Amino acid sequence: MTFAVKFWGIRGSIACPSPEYIKYGGNTSCLEVIADDRHIVLDAGTGIRGLGKKFLAHDIREAHLLLTHTHWDHINGFPFFVPAYDPNRSIHIMAGHLNAEQGGIRYALSQQMDSPMFPVPLEAMRANLRFEDFEAGDEFNIAGVRVRTVPLNHPNGATGYRLEYNGK
């Protein structure tokens, strides 16, 4: 049984790609949780670009992406997540901090990739993208991984996640 976490990015606010930050890395928020053959990604900061390269190299075709919130440092790597452009892959994207007036997670990500902010629209991503909004405080399962959520005190709202698998 495998249950492991890898940090692909831990920086807040802005990526720091210089030698003085190499000890802890310079990418913004992105964590990979591996539960046997399941891949759950927390946040899509600049670290998701490297994770995408791993997904391609290891032919990982399915993942869940749980977003804590949609501040730039948590989503600005998403347009550079190459697996999202591959029609042979499936990504289930979830968020619990957006209310109906904010349009949901699909709308937030499409706005980030809309002209004039970005030259490639969300619709260019050919993977099977599923978008799901929930309410922070909900609990759900991802293929045997129990996910408990909690609302966080953060500007514009955020969601905390607790993942449990086989008693861990």
Language model: regions and residue ranges:
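Binuclear metal-dependent hydrolase catalytic cores
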Residues: M1-K168
